[in-house]
Amino acid sequence: MFHSDHTTIQIIGHLLIAFLFIYRCLTAMPRFAEHSSRLASRGIPFSGFVLTFGLGFMLVGGVSVAIDYYAQYGSVLLILFTMAAIYVHHNFWDTTDPMEKNRKLYIACNNTAVIGGILLIISL
């Protein structure tokens, strides 16, 4: 399952990152229509198709990282998804309301930190 050279801390890191994405994917699936409509309202063409790929990236990437099977490739999927989420959903640069801008910036910063954790998985 895990490479023999992984420490316990590295395994825990893998599992925590994977849990975040798998959990969010599984909780988003039942609300597919709602999420697809939100993407469409933001001007994303073929929103259902885009959402399907996004959920697939989260699930495949998360499972890949969790079981350490091609974890580097799964990590790339998770980074691409997270970067897209920052651009589409947490675009603080386009927000005029100061409270909303601060909320989006906070979430974008958290997502940037998650990308940092994923990069550490790639480096293993």
Task: Give the positions of each predicted feature.
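Interfacial loop at the N-terminal end of multi-pass membrane proteins
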Residues: 38-44
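Extended, low-polarity transmembrane helix blocks
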Residues: 1-34, 45-60, 66-124
